[in-house]
Amino acid sequence: MRKLLIPSIVLIIAALLMSMFVIPEGERGIVIRFGRVLKDNNDLARIYEPGLHFKMPLFDRVKTLDARIQTMDGRSDRFVTSEKKDVIIDTYVKWRIEDFGQYYLATGGGNALTAEALLERKVTDVLRSEIGAREIKQIVSGPRNVAVLPENADSSELTTEAAKEAMEIDGQRDQIMSEVLNDTRESAMKDLGVYVVDFRMKKINLPDEISESIYRRMRAERESVARKHRSQGREKAEVIRAQAELEVATILAEADKTARVTRGTADAEAAKIYSDAYKKDPEFFSFLRSLRAYEKSFNSKNDILVLDPNSEFFQYMNNAKGAAAK
């Protein structure tokens, strides 16, 4: 009996150890019994949380699966737009296992590489459909994003409204990613037991053979808009300049008119003063006019006057008595 006791204890301990298994943190376990996933009362795969668990030795096999969010970097692939132009897009997908039983069966034993290959195929098919329905400029930009200025364009030459009109593009990049995420999430859950957490387009490139022609066309479009607004600006400048010149001419004409009126009023006032003075004392006024005539006549030493001494011009010089009286 003692000889059998020790082997029995060893067998019991071995069986106990073989029936125990530990699920690490961040993983989940499923038990495979006779090639089938062990299920619960709801006919769903029985999931073992992290910790210590027990199984039937020899009959059960434990498969641990990563329950954390995983990232799949998609390979660069070519897609054709609605303009029949090629674009090269790099993507990535974040996913996690949701239905571990379905995942195990769909991937042939829980192979992550197989899961990513199947998931990438689904993503590529949906993305190809979305890209084929849009133009390049819609694909590369987000909602109402501002596109890149052409190399030779000067944004300072555009007004704020003109620049906004010239540079705004109805970008649909975010919409594309949302559509791909929703469509892929539904089919991946159904077929693979995988929940797609996020999908992003990392990089969008143009093939070398078409990128230059696209850039030339975009530059031409932007330059055309810029020329249009510069032309409108010059027209407005000409209108403003003409209005300013008209206002200047009007102001100068009004000023000249006012000056003429003022000068005429002053001349009339002076003539009136002279007339009133003459009426008060005609002889004194005549004498004063003669003195001014003498001053102007004899102002220059080189002038020679040939006059009759008895003329009226010399009346105040010849008539001392009359001059004294004056």
Swiss-Prot record:
Keyword annotations of the record: Membrane, Transmembrane, Transmembrane helix
Pfam families, A to Z: Band_7
- Name the gene that codes for it: hflC
**Function comment:** HflC and HflK could regulate a protease.
What is the name of the protein in this document?
Protein HflC
Transmembrane among keywords: yes
Chief location: membrane
Q: Which organism is it from?
A: Vibrio cholerae serotype O1 (strain ATCC 39315 / El Tor Inaba N16961)
PANTHER family referenced in this protein's UniProt entry, alphabetically:
MODULATOR OF FTSH PROTEASE HFLC
Membrane topology designation: Single-pass membrane protein
The subunit field of the Swiss-Prot or TrEMBL record says:
HflC and HflK may interact to form a multimeric complex.
